[in-house]
Curated annotation (Swiss-Prot):
InterPro entries: MISS. The modification N-acetylserine is found at S2. Signal peptide: none annotated. Keywords: Acetylation, Phosphoprotein. Residues 16-26 have a biased composition (Polar residues). The modification Phosphoserine is found at S2, S6, S15. Residues 34-43 have a biased composition (Low complexity). Belongs to the MISS family. Residues 1-240 are annotated as: Disordered. It comes from Bos taurus. It comes from the Eukaryota. This is MAPK-interacting and spindle-stabilizing protein-like. It holds the Pfam family MISS. Residues 44-66, 74-122, 159-185, 193-202 have a biased composition (Pro residues).
Length: 240
C-alpha cells in the first residue's frame, strides 16, 4: 500500500465528485492538462535559449572594440577611439566670396567747390580780424618787440566805458542820531494828525461791570472756635 493519499481514495466509486479529470498527482507536479512549457518538469522539451547575445559571444563593457585585456579589464581604455581621425573643417571663410565684377574705386579728379564757407577759427579777444594787420611778433610769440598799438597783442578788449573822473564828488550826508527818523527827500508829509479818520464805535449792548459777586451758600459751615481753626487730627493738643 502506498503512503500517498489522494482525494480519489476518500470518495466512493459512484460519487459524482469522482471524475476522470481528477488524477493522482503530487503537490509539486502540475496537472496533466497543462502545457509542458517548463523544461524542468518536461525533460523531453528542448531547452529554451535566452534572447540576446549568442552563448559563444562575450559581453563587452565598452561600446567599441573587443574586450580589453590587462590588469583592469572593466575599465574602458583611454585615448581616441580606434579608426581614422575625423576630418578637420576647411580653413578660410565660412562662405565663398561673391562672384562677379567688383565695384571700381571712387571718382578721382577735382572736387566741386563747397557751397558754404569754412568756419572761422577762434581768436583771442582784441585780436585784429585780418591776420595781415597784426603787428610784428617778437622772439616770445605774441609779445611785440615794439610799442603797443591799440588792439595789438592784447588779450582783453578795450573797455567801452570810460573810467570815472577823479573830479569832486558831493559830500556824504551827515550821520543820523540813533533813534531819529531819517529825512525824506522825496514827497511831503500830509499835514494833520495821522490815524484813522474816525474813532472806533463803542460796542453795542450793555455788559455787567466787573466787581464782587455774592458767595453761594455753603451747607458745610465750619464753626468758629476760640483759636479760629479746629485742631488737626493727630496734631498737638493743648491741655487746660
Amino acid at each position: 500500500m502506498s503512503d500517498e493519499f489522494s482525494l480519489a481514495d476518500a470518495l466512493p466509486e459512484n460519487s459524482p465528485a469522482k471524475t476522470s479529470a481528477v488524477s493522482n498527482t503530487k503537490p509539486g507536479q502540475p496537472p496533466q492538462g497543462w502545457p509542458g512549457s517548463n523544461p524542468w518538469n518536461n525533460p523531453s522539451a528542448p531547452p529554451a535559449v535566452p534572447s540576446g547575445l549568442p552563448p559563444s559571444a562575450t559581453p563587452s563593457p565598452v561600446p567599441f572594440g573587443p574586450t580589453p585585456t590587462g590588469m583592469y579589464p572593466s575599465v574602458p581604455p583611454t585615448g581616441p577611439p580606434p579608426g581614422p581621425p575625423a576630418p578637420f573643417p576647411p580653413s578660410g571663410p565660412s562662405c565663398p566670396p561673391p562672384g562677379g565684377p567688383y565695384p571700381g574705386p571712387g571718382p578721382t579728379g577735382p572736387y566741386p567747390t563747397p557751397n558754404m564757407p569754412f568756419p572761422e577759427l577762434p581768436r583771442p579777444y582784441g585780436a585784429p580780424t585780418d591776420p595781415a594787420a597784426a603787428g610784428p611778433l617778437g622772439p616770445w610769440g605774441s609779445m611785440s618787440s615794439g610799442p603797443w598799438a591799440p588792439g595789438m597783442g592784447g588779450q582783453y578788449p578795450t573797455p567801452n566805458m570810460p573810467y570815472p573822473s577823479p573830479g569832486p564828488y558831493p559830500a556824504p550826508p551827515p550821520p543820523q542820531a540813533p533813534g531819529a527818523a531819517p529825512p525824506v527827500p522825496w514827497g511831503t508829509v500830509p499835514p494833520g494828525a495821522w490815524g484813522p479818520p474816525a474813532p472806533y464805535p463803542a460796542p453795542a449792548g450793555s455788559y455787567p461791570t466787573p466787581g464782587l459777586y455774592p458767595t453761594p451758600n455753603n451747607p458745610f459751615q465750619v464753626p468758629s472756635g476760640p483759636s479760629g481753626a479746629p485742631p488737626m487730627p493727630g496734631g498737638p493738643h493743648s491741655y487746660h
